[in-house]
């Protein structure tokens, strides 16, 4: 099993690479790529950790060597948010980065499962899809926007609010991966009841959690460590699915035939071909239904931006 991390020298990339080095199955290969010259050194640093995961690092303009034979590609390359920016402000820089990297993926490892971390995810996943379509290798079951950070934040915040063991908290987050498009389905959390005020406050906190971190870091970065953990969880789930493990379910932003938008985050069953099945997200409350319907214009606009960028 070979996993490639693109953008591996950045804050998210290094955290993700560390977690993968310690958690990937024995015998796996971990391939790190970044434009930054430090990248081979990051690989050497990680190689001293005593796990049976081989690490190699590649720097420079061309990620091809890092991508050869990759089963899973996790893309975190791009610039991070600073105070006063929202995820859409990142579009102007990150759109081109994602396009260029995906052109290499399309040629070098078109069958790989690709998880996009680079923001704005609502748009960058659409860019990735268009690049793969133009190359004639698009498979909607192999492309994912990683929204796991919204899920782990939801789990954490709910456990804190209600005094629960966080390992027991399960919550689906649907929609997209920015602002109002992030919709945690709090009505479905088992064994917990929320007041209307708690639902409104919790939903807003989850939607704005990225900004909470950006402001707390005071210009020193964005959510890198928690995003690294979220991406590792999702990446390991992709690997487990590829290895034939049963009942591997995660939420992700996918081209899954949703009635709501071309790309929509909801629970998916993972397997040997990526998405084995898009799962229904179930009964939702009136508050959630209203929030879902209200986000769709924003989400569709984000997707359209990505499609038009590649044209």
Swiss-Prot record:
Q: What is its EC number?
A: 1.1.1.37
Q: Does the keyword NAD apply?
A: yes
Pfam families (alphabetical): Ldh_1_C (PF02866), Ldh_1_N (PF00056)
Q: Spell out the Gene3D superfamilies in the cross-references.
A: Lactate dehydrogenase/glycoside hydrolase, family 4, C-terminal, NAD(P)-binding Rossmann-like Domain
Q: Tell me the PROSITE patterns matching this sequence.
A: MDH
A GO CC term attached to the entry: cytoplasm
Q: Which SUPFAM superfamilies match?
A: LDH C-terminal domain-like, NAD(P)-binding Rossmann-fold domains
Per the Swiss-Prot or TrEMBL record, the active site comprises 177 (proton acceptor)
Reaction it catalyzes: (S)-malate + NAD(+) = oxaloacetate + NADH + H(+)
Tell me the residue numbers annotated for binding NAD(+). Answer: 7-13, 34, 94, 117-119, 227
Q: Which residues bind substrate?
A: 81, 87, 119, 153
**What InterPro entries does this protein's entry cite?**
L-lactate/malate_DH, Lactate/malate_DH_C, Lactate/malate_DH_N, Lactate_DH/Glyco_Ohase_4_C, Malate_DH_AS, Malate_DH_type1, Malate_DH_type1_bac, NAD(P)-bd_dom_sf
**Sorted UniProt keywords:** NAD, Oxidoreductase, Tricarboxylic acid cycle
- Please list the GO terms describing molecular function: L-malate dehydrogenase (NAD+) activity
- Free-text function comment from the UniProt entry: Catalyzes the reversible oxidation of malate to oxaloacetate.
Quaternary data:
Homodimer.
- Provide the family line: Belongs to the LDH/MDH superfamily. MDH type 1 family.
> What name does the UniProt record give this protein?
Malate dehydrogenase
**Natural source organism:** Shewanella frigidimarina (strain NCIMB 400)
């Amino acid at each position: 099993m070979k996993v490639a991390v693109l953008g591996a020298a950045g804050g998210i990339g290094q955290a993700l690479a560390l977690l993968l080095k310690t958690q990937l199955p024995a015998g796996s290969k971990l391939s790190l790529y970044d434009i930054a010259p430090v990248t081979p050194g990051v690989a050497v640093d990680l190689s001293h950790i005593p796990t049976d995961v081989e690490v190699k690092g590649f720097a420079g303009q061309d990620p091809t060597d890092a991508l050869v034979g990759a089963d899973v590609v996790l893309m975190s390359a791009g610039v991070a948010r600073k105070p006063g920016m929202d995820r859409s402000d990142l579009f102007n820089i990150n759109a081109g980065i994602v396009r260029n990297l995906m052109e290499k993926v399309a040629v070098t490892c078109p069958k790989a499962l690709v998880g996009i971390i680079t923001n704005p995810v609502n748009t960058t996943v659409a860019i990735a899809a268009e690049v793969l379509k133009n190359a004639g290798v698009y498979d909607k079951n192999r492309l994912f926007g990683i929204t796991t950070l919204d899920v782990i934040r939801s789990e954490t915040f709910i456990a804190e609010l209600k005094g629960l063991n966080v390992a027991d908290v399960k919550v689906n987050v649907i929609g997209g991966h920015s602002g109002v498009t992030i919709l945690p389905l709090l009505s479905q959390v088992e064994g917990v009841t929320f007041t209307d005020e708690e639902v409104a406050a919790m939903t807003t906190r989850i939607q704005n959690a990225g900004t909470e971190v950006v402001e707390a870091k005071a210009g020193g970065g964005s959510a890198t460590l928690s995003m690294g953990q979220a991406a590792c969880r999702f990446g390991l789930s992709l690997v487990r699915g590829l290895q034939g493990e049963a009942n591997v379910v995660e939420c992700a932003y996918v081209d899954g035939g949703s009635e709501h938008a071309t790309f929509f985050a909801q629970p998916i069953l993972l397997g040997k071909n990526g998405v084995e099945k898009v799962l229904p997200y179930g009964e939702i409350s009136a508050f959630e239904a209203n929030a879902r319907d209200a986000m769709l214009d924003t989400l569709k606009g984000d997707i359209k931006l990505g499609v038009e960028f590649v044209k």
